[in-house]
């Protein structure tokens, strides 16, 4: 059973990684056509549609924690398990649900609203370089919000195998950032982006490092409790 769990998780992780191919094509080929005036800038062309492969990657990683696999002692499925310390489990789940809500609706809404100022009509060719709002803190706030939201969801469900493979999802998102930078931002904004990159961290500022430390603490505590009750 554990072997099957690993296989299913790895297969989905590979599928999500392969979704980078249309994403790469969208920026590599699509932007070349933009530069040669051979492609309209509307959101209806096939290259813009390929951009949405990034959303399928995200969905796959929301599905993976639900699959059958070993789980941490504290998780939402064991909320009413009498063998689990109820008070700690309730508090654990409340905290993670709050974190999901924050990164999905508070952080996410701010970033999306800010992002749409430049990408509403054309995803592959932003109308301007966004450097204010959340983008003043880090250059990739949308990616960071997505990563922390997925991590919260994985921990809420106590999905151990998905957590072990989470590094793959991080690598996928770093690849997405590299693709966007190389074929879009660095092409259209050049000096402006170079100056922006000098003064703004790509992924982590002090606030996000505090979140990362908090998540690490949660993982360590839950790992300890899980091994304690084996």
What residue ranges belong to the model's regions?
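Membrane-anchoring alpha-helices and their flanking helix-loop junctions
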Residues: 1-131, 148-188, 194-230
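Helix-capping/helix-break motifs at membrane-protein junctions
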Residues: 139, 189-190
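Histidine-centered phosphotransfer motif of kinases
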Residues: 132, 136-144
């Amino acid at each position: 059973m554990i072997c099957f769990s690993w296989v299913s998780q790895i297969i989905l992780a590979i599928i999500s990684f392969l979704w980078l191919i249309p994403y790469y094509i969208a920026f590599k080929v699509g932007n070349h056509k933009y530069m040669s005036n051979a492609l309209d800038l509307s959101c209806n062309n096939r290259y813009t549609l390929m951009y949405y492969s990034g959303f399928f990657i995200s969905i796959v990683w929301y599905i993976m924690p639900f699959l059958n696999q070993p789980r941490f002692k504290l998780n939402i499925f064991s909320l009413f398990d009498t063998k689990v310390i109820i008070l700690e489990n309730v508090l654990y789940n409340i905290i993670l649900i709050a974190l999901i809500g924050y990164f999905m609706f508070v952080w996410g809404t701010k970033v999306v609203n800010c992002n749409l100022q430049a990408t509403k009509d054309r995803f592959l060719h932003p109308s301007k370089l966004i450097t204010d709002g959340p983008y003043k803190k880090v250059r990739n706030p949308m990616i960071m919000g997505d990563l922390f939201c997925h991590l919260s969801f994985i921990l809420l469900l106590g999905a151990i195998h998905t957590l072990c493979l989470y590094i793959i999802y991080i690598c996928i998102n770093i690849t997405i950032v590299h693709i966007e930078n190389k074929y879009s931002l660095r092409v259209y904004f050049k000096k402006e982006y170079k100056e922006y990159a000098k003064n703004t961290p790509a992924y982590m500022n002090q606030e996000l490092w505090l979140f990362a430390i908090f998540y690490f603490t949660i993982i360590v505590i839950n790992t300890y409790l899980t091994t304690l009750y084996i």
